[in-house]
């Protein structure tokens, strides 16, 4: 691989990982001691498959809204531009297993959802690009492989 880059994920050998997985991608400590924990939540195998944008977009909305019902430590859930996963960030919450539980509970909530939150032109920048059914399929697939989430390299 090339020289070390500033972006953590650019230093990850994407040919060596095996999706699905959840890995701690980085930590940051603020000037007042607060700590941010960023997780790579990988739904699809890099460079082999990806999430279709309407499903990914709806899953982002659903997870961003529903996860906050289970924790006040969530900072953000952001989709990856490569459409293979999300970044999930917490503040002052360094419990990996609990982060997995929050994710699992949130995805279970997605399966029960009857609408996509903020799926309108006032609250969303591309309201026409959503798929509740697609989001549910992604959540169901990821949950079905929960036993693999801790195994980043398929060992």
UniProtKB/Swiss-Prot annotation:
It catalyses: S-(5-deoxy-D-ribos-5-yl)-L-homocysteine = (S)-4,5-dihydroxypentane-2,3-dione + L-homocysteine. Involved in the synthesis of autoinducer 2 (AI-2) which is secreted by bacteria and is used to communicate both the cell density and the metabolic potential of the environment. The regulation of gene expression in response to changes in cell density is called quorum sensing. Catalyzes the transformation of S-ribosylhomocysteine (RHC) to homocysteine (HC) and 4,5-dihydroxy-2,3-pentadione (DPD). NCBIfam families: PRK02260.1-4. GO terms for molecular function: iron ion binding; S-ribosylhomocysteine lyase activity. GO terms for biological process: quorum sensing. Fe cation binds at residues 57, 61, 124. The keyword Endoplasmic reticulum does not apply. Homodimer. Binds 1 Fe cation per subunit. It is an enzyme of class 4 (lyase). Belongs to the LuxS family. It holds the Pfam family LuxS. SUPFAM superfamilies: LuxS/MPP-like metallohydrolase (SSF63411). This is S-ribosylhomocysteine lyase. Keywords: Autoinducer synthesis, Iron, Lyase, Metal-binding, Quorum sensing. Its EC number is 4.4.1.21. The keyword Metal-binding applies. Its cofactor is Fe cation. It comes from the Bacteria.
């Amino acid at each position: 691989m090339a020289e070390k880059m500033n972006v953590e994920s650019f230093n990850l050998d994407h040919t060596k990982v095996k999706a699905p997985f959840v890995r701690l991608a980085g930590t940051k400590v603020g000037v007042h001691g607060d700590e941010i924990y960023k997780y790579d939540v990988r739904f699809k195998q890099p460079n082999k498959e990806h999430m279709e944008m309407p499903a990914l977009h709806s899953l982002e909305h659903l997870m961003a809204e529903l996860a906050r019902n289970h924790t006040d430590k969530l900072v953000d859930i952001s989709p990856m531009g490569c459409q293979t996963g999300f970044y999930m960030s917490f503040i002052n919450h360094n419990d990996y297993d609990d982060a997995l539980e929050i994710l699992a509970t949130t995805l279970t909530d997605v399966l029960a959802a009857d609408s996509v939150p903020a799926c309108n032109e006032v609250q969303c920048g591309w309201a026409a690009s959503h798929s509740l059914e697609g989001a549910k399929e992604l959540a169901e697939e990821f949950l079905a492989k929960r036993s693999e989430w801790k195994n980043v390299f398929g060992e």
